[in-house]
UniProtKB/Swiss-Prot annotation:
Degradation of ssDNA requires Mn(2+), Co(2+) or Ni(2+); Mg(2+), Ca(2+) or Zn(2+) do not activate ssDNase activity. Formation of cOA requires Mn(2+), Co(2+) or Zn(2+), Mg(2+) is not as efficient. It catalyses: 6 ATP = cyclic hexaadenylate + 6 diphosphate. Belongs to the CRISPR-associated Cas10/Csm1 family. Residues 509-647 form the GGDEF domain. The N-terminal HD domain has ssDNase activity. The C-terminal GGDEF domain has the cOA synthesis activity. Its EC number is 3.1.-.-, 2.7.7.-. Signal peptide: none annotated. It comes from Streptococcus thermophilus. Keywords: Antiviral defense, ATP-binding, Endonuclease, Exonuclease, Hydrolase, Nuclease, Nucleotide-binding, RNA-binding, Transferase. One of its GO terms (biological process) is defense response to virus. The keyword ATP-binding applies. This is CRISPR system single-strand-specific deoxyribonuclease Cas10/Csm1 (subtype III-A). Part of the Csm effector complex that includes at least Cas10(1), Csm2(3), Csm3(5), Csm4(1), Csm5(1) and mature crRNA. The Csm complex is elongated and slightly twisted with a maximal length of 215 Angstroms and a diameter of 75-80 Angstroms. It has been modeled to have a central protein filamant of Csm3 subunits along which the dsRNA helix of paired crRNA and target RNA binds. The filament is capped at one end by Cas10 and Csm4 and at the other end by Csm5; ssDNA is thought to bind to the N-terminal HD domain of Cas10.
Amino acid sequence: MKKEKIDLFYGALLHDIGKVIQRATGERKKHALVGADWFDEIADNQVISDQIRYHMANYQSDKLGNDHLAYITYIADNIASGVDRRQSNEESDEDASAKIWDTYTNQADIFNVFGAQTDKRYFKPTVLNLKSKPNFASATYEPFSKGDYAAIATRIKNELAEFEFNQAQIDSLLNLFEAILSFVPSSTNSKEIADISLAEHSRLTAAFALAIYDYLEDKGRHNYKEDLFTKASAFYEEEAFLLASFDLSGIQDFIYNIATSGAAKQLKARSLYLDFMSEYIADSLLDKLGLNRANLLYVGGGHAYFVLANTEKTVETLVQFEKDFNQFLLANFQTRLYVAFGWGSFAAKDIMSELNSPESYRQIYQKASRMISEKKISRYDYRTLMLLNRGGKSSERECEICHSVENLVSYHDQKVCDICRGLYQFSKEIAHDHFIITENEGLPIGPNACLKGVAFEKLSQESFSRVYVKNDYKAGTIKATHVFVGDYQCDEIHKYAALSKNEDGLGIKRLAVVRLDVDDLGAAFMAGFSRQGNGQYSTLSRSATFSRSMSLFFKVYINQFASDKKLSIIYAGGDDVFAIGSWQDIIAFTVELRQNFIKWTNGKLTLSAGIGLFADKTPISLMAHQTGELEEAAKGNEKDSISLFSSDYTFKFDRFITNVYDDKLEQIRYFFNHQDERGKNFIYKLIELLRNYESEEKMNVARLAYYLTRLEELTDKDERDKFKQFKKLFFKWYTNNESDRKEAELALLLYVYEIRKD
């Protein structure tokens, strides 16, 4: 990036820093002035300072040249906010302050205006600590204090004490803002909804500022005052922007369709590798466009969204980048992986809440989505197809892991391809928190780029172009790009079946796999904010906040839900999960994850899950396939469901948790834990009766009465009162309805698995 764009980025990102200082000190003057004065104390950069000081329409200066960057920051702020702020007051205005400003309000939940129902939930005033418990929104209103803001202001000032405001430190400041300002509301106007954080608004303002700069530069227009201030309403009509997106296809097959007993060791490495590939695709594209991560709205699960300038150069760069990266994928993965880019132009009016319609907002995303879909149908041009066909069938053996026939080598007594050999090495590095991009050392991740995990203390010894850090914010000297990764791992995959046994050696020796994802997330993303207020809440800032909320839940907090459980998170995208572990802990994890997800989204979104039960030597590909079928069975049950072990045991989530997991299973444990082996053997007879109820209903009721009487005789005298309660309860389950019988059958089966001795 050239110096002018770097200054523009910092000015746009810091334009509202005065709000933090103003709330900390209570100063009664424009936040733009407060922010600029504060900045001048810590840095010597007049261009950045002027953007902070003059980014408000009612505080422009005749001293500014027509080509001053402050005009770009001004209109970018308006677009990011979704309103034209020429007529707005602010917190320091004496007349308006008492009436409309709630200076210390805490941030509202993004899901308050999501879906059809309006809610009032708020976040606790805090920083974003990735190691602490999730900051769940609640109905409790707990405002900030001056002291809270003073602590935030002090931390920012301390972090920026040695800051150079150059290109190398851009990611550091983005990290700092996300860590400190994610629960600080951008607007405290009581007539607005304070659900957009200052971190998100500042980031989006910087994104639009950089895109506007490129757009006007391309057209040779440098009278920013005229174009962006005097004639701002005309600029809002110009299709100055592109919403660009990419989709990386083949992720599921790449991770799960692997053979051999040693493949399990690669499983997490393959997943993490593709996570970083998506990150690298995004960063590489931004580098080529002379942009940074402010322009990246979202990345995760093989998808990403960007705000870019609508110029021929941008489109040419997208086309060439897509071509080059697919050449890399073809050379290393043949047709197993493919990346498709899509984009669509839009004007500021299409995303500004006072000017847009829900339909125009959806169309922005649909343009990009349609282009991607068309490319995925027809992936390769004629020349590429001819080259692929000319290769014919290789005479070499297949890679014993991924079945590739290209570039095979011998490694650990196996015939493997170069990529799988690299993944073996990478699997030893995934415990590190830092991952570097080098030119030629490590696992190929893009054209002339390799990925390598490195211990923190050895970073200074390495040569790299970029460093990523997992689940941690690093500002200052490290200059790292943080990435969210769901990577909890208790033990090696092959050990989980044995770990299903308790300390007494009881429990069926099986592992379990869960696959789950959010129901109808695509529709929710495009239209979730359109159902209230005639679509006025459909804004880019809310879409970006929504996406980051999903990433935070599924890539960070998921590690906490898994902690202390015997399982490994293999894959956690922005909305879907694949995990392997002891079968008891996989069920417990799924229940905990689902209940926390309902709490996180206030019940506005649901998820569906399939859980499969397998012997420890079952091929990964088979486990993934069969569990995927169970997930589909859950989706087929009108979603918000779980399918456990077999599609026969498919329940609505609430029904499974309330009636089976927390009730019937507990009742069965309470009684049968006091029975000897003879008593426990009757469980199989009870299961058989439940399964055969329809065949001979009257006869089976009589058999049940007989079995329960025999079971009572085997029960110790001091336990018989307890048994009578169970007898009455079970008879009710059996005779009540099919739902109760199916729930009782699964509860008994789960208990049998808990007490098996094999």
